[in-house]
Amino acid sequence: MDRVLLRWISLFWLTAMVEGLQVTVPDKKKVAMLFQPTVLRCHFSTSSHQPAVVQWKFKSYCQDRMGESLGMSSTRAQSLSKRNLEWDPYLDCLDSRRTVRVVASKQGSTVTLGDFYRGREITIVHDADLQIGKLMWGDSGLYYCIITTPDDLEGKNEDSVELLVLGRTGLLADLLPSFAVEIMPEWVFVGLVLLGVFLFFVLVGICWCQCCPHSCCCYVRCPCCPDSCCCPQALYEAGKAAKAGYPPSVSGVPGPYSIPSVPLGGAPSSGMLMDKPHPPPLAPSDSTGGSHSVRKGYRIQADKERDSMKVLYYVEKELAQFDPARRMRGRYNNTISELSSLHEEDSNFRQSFHQMRSKQFPVSGDLESNPDYWSGVMGGSSGASRGPSAMEYNKEDRESFRHSQPRSKSEMLSRKNFATGVPAVSMDELAAFADSYGQRPRRADGNSHEARGGSRFERSESRAHSGFYQDDSLEEYYGQRSRSREPLTDADRGWAFSPARRRPAEDAHLPRLVSRTPGTAPKYDHSYLGSARERQARPEGASRGGSLETPSKRSAQLGPRSASYYAWSPPGTYKAGSSQDDQEDASDDALPPYSELELTRGPSYRGRDLPYHSNSEKKRKKEPAKKTNDFPTRMSLVV
């Protein structure tokens, strides 16, 4: 009986073991590489017909594996492992001392990831296998596979596997992970790229310096713009020539004064071109030729006391300050003509001709034979003692020196040719006119009184002309002048006379005729001829009393333009006044203005008044002479 009972108990136990839950993991420890995929396998068996719930948990190491690899494990852990051979100090510890996380869980076909592993390539495949896409450094640890069934509670429902994540050692890191170079190593390719970028920036810097007006490293030819270098190539060649000691050969450069429509002249002074008063040490080349000979360039004298680079820097500084427009302005604006230089020292233009004659002009003939003059101007400031003597300067050297000196504008202009036979007003004639105008000799006969009376009458007539402009409005007078483009005539200025000349006494009664138009012969005034005929027809007393209508007045009646064309001063026919009045009038008279415009006026605009003059002559001959003033005559004063 007892034997039968024992057999049934053993059979029941065997049946329970076969029908219970069993979970197994084929690999207890697995090693995987970093950033590589891996699969942790898990198998289970159950007698339940309902779907099981699969869950994977992660438990970190109890101790860091890094200390074990470096030999830094504690002595206590080693002693415990020796006592219990089945106990592992890295895996066997309480869950409170390490990190525990749910990796993933599967129920049916639904997979749910834990909070820490969301977003990663992790899933449960097959029945209970855990698949990880890319391993990370924190994935090393202990993974547990847990199977849960609702109607099978007996058996072993979990098992664990150790995962160790390792990295590659002994290999260089990948410089270009997503780019593969097959023809060369990656480090060679990266080095070539960096070198090319550096050379590109160097080329851009050279082109920027050479092609733009900045401080640059000169004499480096830029390949992108070789013709636009900012460095002075000519100055560089001049510096090399200065060091070598021979003149540089510069071809293709035109002359500095070969400008069309501009009169040729000498070279401007050094002060006109540059502000610096000290010129560089230049010496003229050996060129012995006339004014038409071609001169060579200048060569820089070698000086042992000065460094050659100082000369180069000086020339570069002077070229930087050079202004061609300033040179042209100074060439025409700084020249002073001979006529304007007469009044350079004294601003009073109404000075007498004796003071102007007192200034002696230099004579060119005296300078030709003056050795001190040529030794001073051609020898420089060093003096005649150090320079060559005056006899060494021949005629060709003097002519070359004259052509090299700057000339005034009036010397460069062409001279005007006056017609032959026209009396020119020279300084001697002006001086004689000043003597006769201001200081007339007094004679006791009647002719002197008549002359004084005539001159007084002309002055009163000129005052009457000036009074005409004073009585009328200035706007009307200047309006008439502004509408006329012709220059002022002698009558407009208020004076009509000619320089007095010494003539015989028998020709004193004849009129003095002056033609102020170049190129025309002197012409007689027909009004004076008519007045002479009238005096012959009148009785003697009337002729002695004198006609109050003088030729000067008739010339004023003819118009200002006709009076200026036939400008003359006849002998006076009226005796009045005293010596005191004559002295006062002579002292009040001022010299007329003088200009070159009187001689340069052509007969073109004066010839247009000739028909008007002829018509006025006909009217004057038809009308009888009338008294135009109330001056008392000599006969009316006789009691």
From Swiss-Prot:
Signal sequence, start to end: 1-20
Domain Ig-like V-type as annotated: residue spans: 21-162
Principal location class: endoplasmic reticulum
Region span, Disordered: 273-295, 374-415, 437-639
GO cellular component terms listed in the entry, alphabetical order: bicellular tight junction; endoplasmic reticulum membrane; membrane; nucleus; tight junction
Keywords on record: Cell junction, Disulfide bond, Endoplasmic reticulum, Immunoglobulin domain, Membrane, Methylation, Nucleus, Phosphoprotein, Signal, Tight junction, Transmembrane, Transmembrane helix
Gene for this chain: ILDR2
Family statement: Belongs to the immunoglobulin superfamily. LISCH7 family.
Cysteines joined through disulfide linkages: 42-145
Residues bearing the modification Omega-N-methylarginine: 544
GO biological process: cell differentiation; homeostasis of number of cells within a tissue; insulin secretion; negative regulation of T cell activation; pancreas development; regulation of RNA splicing; response to glucose
Membrane topology, record value: Single-pass type I membrane protein
Location of this chain's protein in the cell: Endoplasmic reticulum membrane; Cell junction, Tight junction; Nucleus
Tissues expressing the protein: Expressed in testis, brain, pituitary, colon, heart, nerves, prostate, esophagus, lung liver and small intestine. Highly expressed in macrophages, also expressed in monocytes and at low levels in NK and NKT cells (at protein level).
Record InterPro entries: Ig-like_dom_sf, Ig-like_domain-LISCH7, Ig-like_fold, Ig_sub, LISCH7
Function of the molecule: May be involved in ER stress pathways with effects on lipid homeostasis and insulin secretion. With ILDR1 and LSR, involved in the maintain of the epithelial barrier function through the recruitment of MARVELD2/tricellulin to tricellular tight junctions. Also functions as a B7-like protein family member expressed on immune cells and inflamed tissue and with T-cell inhibitory activity. In the inner ear, may regulate alternative pre-mRNA splicing via binding to TRA2A, TRA2B and SRSF1.
Lumenal side: 21-186
Modified residues (Phosphoserine): 473, 579
Cytoplasmic side: 208-639
Record note on quaternary structure: Interacts with MARVELD2 and OCLN. Interacts with P4HB AND HSPA5; the interaction with HSPA5 stabilizes ILDR2 expression. Interacts (via C-terminus) with TRA2A, TRA2B and SRSF1.
Organism lineage: Eukaryota, Metazoa, Chordata, Craniata, Vertebrata
Biased composition annotated in UniProt, kind: Basic and acidic residues: 393-414, 442-464, 483-493, 606-617
Native source organism of the sequence: Homo sapiens
Protein name, as recorded: Immunoglobulin-like domain-containing receptor 2
Transmembrane segments: 187-207
